[in-house]
Amino acid sequence: MKNVTDSFVSLGHWPSAGSFGWNTDILATNLINLSVVIGVLIFFGKGVLSDLLDNRKQRILNTIRNSEELRGGAIEQLEKARARLRKMEMEADQFRVNGYSEIERDKWNLINSTSKTLEQFENFKNETIQFEQQRAINQVRQRVFQQALQGALGTLNSCLNKELHLRTISANIGILGAMKEITD
C-alpha cells in the first residue's frame, strides 16, 4: 500500500506546463472514489433491485387481475343491458303505434349510460396501473439510493483507518511543499 501511495505522490511532483493540461493526480480526479462507489452500487443494488422489481411485478399483476375482474363485471352488466335492450325492442314492436319515439330514446339512453360506465371502468383500470407503476418506480429509486448510501458509508468507514489517514495527510503536505518550492 505504501508503494501505491508513493507512486501517487511522485505523480504530484511533475511540473505543469501551464494553466491547461491533463491532471495526472489520480487522487485529485476522484477516479478511485467513483469506481468504489459504482462497484458498491452494482454489488449491493442488483439483488435488492431484482427483489423489489419482482415484488412490484406481482403487485402490478394483482392490480391488473383486479381490474380485469372489474372489467368482467362491466361486461356482464353490458350483457344484461343488452338483454334488457332486446326485451325493450320486443316491447317496442308490440307498442310501436303508441310510443315508438319514447322507447327509442330510452334505448339510446341505456346504451349511452352503459358505454360510459364501461369507459369509466377502463379509465380507472388504466389510471390504477399507471399509478402503481409510478409508485413502484419511486419506491425502487428510493430503496436503491438508500442502499447505495449505506453501502458507501460502510465501505468508507471500514477502509479509513488512522495510519492511512496520517499517510494521506503527509503525502498531501509533501505535494503542497513541492508545489510551493516550484512556485518560489
UniProtKB/Swiss-Prot annotation:
Subcellular location: Plastid, Chloroplast thylakoid membrane
Keyword ATP-binding: no
Further comment found in the protein's record: In plastids the F-type ATPase is also known as CF(1)CF(0).
Chain's gene name: atpF
Record function comment: F(1)F(0) ATP synthase produces ATP from ADP in the presence of a proton or sodium gradient. F-type ATPases consist of two structural domains, F(1) containing the extramembraneous catalytic core and F(0) containing the membrane proton channel, linked together by a central stalk and a peripheral stalk. During catalysis, ATP synthesis in the catalytic domain of F(1) is coupled via a rotary mechanism of the central stalk subunits to proton translocation. Component of the F(0) channel, it forms part of the peripheral stalk, linking F(1) to F(0).
InterPro entries documented for this protein: ATP_synth_b/b'su_bac/chlpt
SUBUNIT field: F-type ATPases have 2 components, F(1) - the catalytic core - and F(0) - the membrane proton channel. F(1) has five subunits: alpha(3), beta(3), gamma(1), delta(1), epsilon(1). F(0) has four main subunits: a(1), b(1), b'(1) and c(10-14). The alpha and beta chains form an alternating ring which encloses part of the gamma chain. F(1) is attached to F(0) by a central stalk formed by the gamma and epsilon chains, while a peripheral stalk is formed by the delta, b and b' chains.
CDD domains: ATP-synt_Fo_b
Keywords on record: ATP synthesis, CF(0), Chloroplast, Hydrogen ion transport, Ion transport, Membrane, Plastid, Thylakoid, Transmembrane, Transmembrane helix, Transport
Annotated transmembrane regions: 27-49
Organism expressing this protein natively: Jasminum nudiflorum
Predominant localisation class: plastid
Protein's UniProt name: ATP synthase subunit b, chloroplastic
Family stated for the protein in its record: Belongs to the ATPase B chain family.
Membrane topology listed for this record: Single-pass membrane protein
Cellular component GO terms held in the UniProt record: chloroplast thylakoid membrane; proton-transporting ATP synthase complex
Example of a GO MF term: proton-transporting ATP synthase activity, rotational mechanism
